[in-house]
Amino acid sequence: MGASGHHAPDGSPVELYARLAAGDEPAIVHAAIPAGATVLDLGSGAGRIAHALIALGHPVVAVDNSPEMLEHVRGAEKVLADIRTLELHRRFDCVLLASNLLNCVDATTRAAMLAACARHVAADGCVVIQRLAPGRALTIEEGAWTRGQASFHLTSLIRRGRIFSATMVFELDGKRWRHSFEAELLDDEETDAALAHAGLRRDGFLDESRAWVKARVAV
């Protein structure tokens, strides 16, 4: 039942994310940007979102700090790099920062990632960010659910003010993976402040839960 294999630097199991189907993320991004818009996918992982965006007609540059993750990316230009220090000397119609990377507990890392978004987005482009939905994150509890063929079980939940840690247990095709993580909840004002520090401004939300934020270069 157990599964091992490679893990990304943040602990994400490579085999799992290479097999896990995308949810509604690609549709949310696609609806927020023009047809054929170029996308810089920061923290692309194994390409769950990138592959769907490519199929929808978007040229994608996939950036990740795990070579094992990037091995699974198909159809995109691939860049092995740390988001914080990324410098491609190019601009994109859309810069995507998904997977709740904004909720990292280190404020310096968060600022560096948003700065990377700002220096790679076109003047008339947008930054699309996925964060933990403020309302849901405050009430999250341990429990299990399914999505497609995969099952998820959130366990070992510990809250310390705005910061919480937990372990996610994934099961798919008879295999099981565990991923322990820590995250910091950000409300709208804190998100806006982080964006402003990077020279960005919020341009709206892309879903009812406010988990998806659209930002533009501040003028």
Give each language-model segment a name:
Residues 1-45:
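Conserved class I S-adenosyl-L-methionine
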Residues 46-85:
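Class I SAM-dependent methyltransferase SAM/SAH-binding core
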Residues 87-94:
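A short acidic, Gly/Pro-enriched loop at the edge of an enzyme's catalytic core
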Residues 98-100:
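Residues lining the SAM
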Residues 107, 128-190:
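SAM-dependent methyltransferase
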Residues 111-123:
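A short glycine-rich, Lys/Arg-flanked "PGG" loop and its adjoining helix->strand segment in the class I
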Residues 190, 194-219:
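C-terminal lobe and adjacent flexible extensions of AdoMet/dcAdoMet transferase-like proteins
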